[in-house]
């Protein structure tokens, strides 16, 4: 599974600059999911890959970014 890293409290994507490989996104994806996850900056949001199927990604059901 893959998808945008989401803040569970606000419902917003984690934003980033520096499109493509991005140390911030790699670190945040691994902190949220696990060490084998990877992340990069895509369309100014952290996109995480190699996630487990139950991983929660953006958009959250019934919660809009404020």
From Swiss-Prot:
Residue ranges constituting the LCN-type CS-alpha/beta domain according to the UniProt record: 1-66
InterPro entries in the cross-refs: LCN-type_CS_alpha_beta_dom, Scorpion_toxin-like, Scorpion_toxin-like_sf, Scorpion_toxinL
Disulfide bonds: 12-65, 16-41, 25-46, 29-48
Swiss-Prot/TrEMBL keywords: Disulfide bond, Ion channel impairing toxin, Neurotoxin, Secreted, Toxin, Voltage-gated sodium channel impairing toxin
Location of the protein in the cell: Secreted
GO biological process: defense response; envenomation resulting in negative regulation of voltage-gated sodium channel activity in another organism
Gene3D superfamilies associated with the record: Knottin, scorpion toxin-like
Tissue: Expressed by the venom gland.
UniProt keyword annotation of Ligase present: no
SMART domains cross-referenced by the UniProt entry: Knot1
GO molecular function annotations of the record: sodium channel inhibitor activity; toxin activity
GO cellular component terms, A-Z: extracellular space
Stated family: Belongs to the long (4 C-C) scorpion toxin superfamily. Sodium channel inhibitor family. Beta subfamily.
Domain remark in the UniProt entry: Has the structural arrangement of an alpha-helix connected to antiparallel beta-sheets by disulfide bonds (CS-alpha/beta).
Cited function: Beta toxins bind voltage-independently at site-4 of sodium channels (Nav) and reduces peak current and shifts the voltage of activation toward more negative potentials thereby affecting sodium channel activation and promoting spontaneous and repetitive firing. Has an inhibitory effect on voltage-gated sodium channel hNav1.6/SCN8A, affecting both the activation and inactivation processes. Also reduces the peak current of hNav1.5/SCN5A but does not shift its voltage of activation. This toxin is active against mammals and lethal to mice.
Protein name in the entry: Beta-toxin Cb2
Species of provenance: Centruroides baergi
Lineage: Eukaryota, Metazoa, Ecdysozoa, Arthropoda, Chelicerata
């Amino acid at each position: 599974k893959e998808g945008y890293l989401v803040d569970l409290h606000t419902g917003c994507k984690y934003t980033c600059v520096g499109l493509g490989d991005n140390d911030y996104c790699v670190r945040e994806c691994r902190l949220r999911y696990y060490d084998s996850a990877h992340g990069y900056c895509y369309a100014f949001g952290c996109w995480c890959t190699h996630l487990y199927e139950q991983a929660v990604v953006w958009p959250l059901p019934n919660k809009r970014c404020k």
